[in-house]
């Protein structure tokens, strides 16, 4: 685990539940970011159909990951 971290903010949505939306955002982040250590839910929202039932849940996450230590050459 790196002693230096960086935090990025990402948003995404999924049908089903807030948890599904969180998992979707984290899974997508993991395809390009390594050493994800934690997340914080910053905002939760959603979309509804004509009857008022939720159709999608939207989340905004702060995702923290470790920064790789420099490699010493020599």
Predicted regions and their residues:
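Short, well-ordered alpha-helical segments
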Residues: 2-39
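C-terminal structural segments of small proteins and small subunits
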Residues: 51-74
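Amphipathic alpha-helical hairpins
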Residues: 4, 8, 45, 51-55
């Amino acid at each position: 685990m790196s002693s230096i971290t960086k935090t990025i903010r990402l948003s995404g949505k999924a049908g089903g539940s807030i948890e599904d939306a969180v998992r979707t955002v984290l899974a997508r982040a993991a395809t390009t970011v390594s050493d994800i250590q934690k997340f914080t839910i910053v905002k939760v929202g959603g979309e509804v159909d004509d009857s008022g039932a939720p159709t999608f849940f939207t989340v905004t996450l702060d995702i923290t990951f470790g920064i790789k230590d420099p490699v010493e050459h020599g």
